A protein has these predicted regions:
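Short helix-initiation/N-cap motifs at beta->coil->alpha
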Residues: 58-60, 109-120, 242-250
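Bacterial Sec-exported substrate-binding components of ABC uptake systems
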Residues: 5-7, 11, 21-78, 177-207, ...
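Extracytoplasmic ligand-binding site segments that recognize negatively charged/polar headgroups
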Residues: 138-141, 153-169, 203-225, 269-272
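Structured C-terminal subdomain patch of bacterial secreted/periplasmic proteins
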Residues: 49, 162-165, 172, 181, ...
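A short, structured surface patch at a secondary-structure boundary
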Residues: 71-125, 129-135
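Short secondary-structure boundary segments
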Residues: 76, 134-135, 210, 242-245, ...
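Alpha-helical, coiled-coil/dimerization segments enriched in small aliphatic residues
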Residues: 98-101, 217-245
Length: 331
């Protein structure tokens, strides 16, 4: 039991670290890039002559490969998901230690990643390409990797449009352009259809809990995927006035009185589920969402990880709130 609690605490801390450091360090050199990039611009990025590939990564760096990569190390969980989604998962020869989806990625050798990435482990795997986020390495580390013949490609989505760009970029690097386009098109279709029906959710208010009470409450404010999806669905994020991932108090949640609570806390099979824990919190019984039991637990990173399943998370949230609205109408 104690082990599970410690593991849960570690997971919560890692999730917050990944969210809080979703920006580039000052010492990574970046070429100038357009601040606003839409899907149409992204679709025009790949430009290949013969078997060679030329593209621009998400730090504005020019990427040139003699041919589509066949050996890849991906440090971020989102990039691993993208590779499998576009049918290129078999190209992975190494992954960041926190990459966990889909299940088959766990069969790929793991390398130490995050703030203490192990350069020697990566070089030993002899990849042609390393997929990394903007905050993953310093400029000196990038030079070390590229001196070893490894092309570093930055994939760093900060909004839904950035996810489209990341998928398109990885499709270009792997020669899976058409598969990438299909994934992006499917996501666009899903999200577009949801936005058309946003009025059906009646502007319900929602509180996103990204870290549970026992580890300190954190929520998603402006500039996060969760807030972007809430806005798309016509929902009101009760902490939209916060910026990024914000630490909050119980009193602030009680005052906000959300109609719906979305928690991404993990459950490891012992004790209360995340929903049961929220329902049992002293003093929370007067919150509308708690009073009505309108609490959604999404444990699989659909709303927090910048990958293809963002659309699935949006669909799950829409369906949950739509059911609440329908039930209220029937009452």
């Amino acid at each position: 039991m104690k082990t599970n609690k410690l593991f849960a605490a570690l997971i919560a801390a890692l999730l917050l670290l990944g969210m809080l450091f979703a920006c580039a360090p000052a010492d990574i050199a970046a070429a100038p890039a357009n601040e606003a990039t839409n899907l149409q611009e992204v679709d025009e990025i790949p430009a290949a002559e013969g078997t060679g590939i030329e593209t621009i990564d998400m730090m504005g760096r020019e990427i040139k490969l003699p041919e589509a990569a066949t050996r890849i190390v991906a440090l971020s969980a989102a990039d691993c998901e993208i590779l499998y989604a576009i049918g290129a998962g078999d190209l992975l020869v190494g992954r960041g230690e926190f990459c966990d989806y889909p299940a088959q990625v766990l069969d790929v050798p793991a390398v130490q990643s995050g703030m203490e990435t192990n350069m020697e482990q990566i070089i030993a795997l002899a990849p042609q390409v390393l997929l990394m986020s903007a905050m993953a390495q310093t400029e000196d580390q990038v030079k070390q990797l590229e001196a070893a013949g490894i092309q570093c490609v930055v994939s760093d989505a900060k909004d839904i449009n950035g996810v489209y760009q990341a998928i398109t970029l990885i499709g270009a690097v792997t020669g899976h352009d058409e598969d990438a386009f299909a994934v992006v098109s499917s996501m666009e279709t899903t999200l577009s259809e949801l936005s058309v029906h946003a009025s059906e959710l009646q502007g319900k208010s929602v509180y996103f809990e990204v870290s549970p009470l026992q580890y300190g409450l954190w929520t998603a404010g402006k500039g996060t995927f969760m807030d972007e999806i809430a806005t798309m669905l016509g929902l009101t994020n009760v902490f939209a006035d916060a910026t990024g991932w914000a630490e909050i108090s119980e009193e602030q949640v009680l005052k906000a009185n959300p109609d719906v609570i979305v928690t991404i806390a993990m459950y490891f099979g012992e004790g209360q589920t995340p929903v049961e824990e929220i329902l049992a919190r002293p003093g929370w019984q007067d919150i509308t969402a708690v009073k009505n039991g309108d609490i959604l637990n999404l444990q699989n990173n659909e709303l927090s990880r910048p990958g293809p399943r963002i659309a699935d998370g949006a669909q799950a949230l829409f369906d949950f709130v739509k059911a609440i609205v329908s039930e209220n109408k029937a009452a």
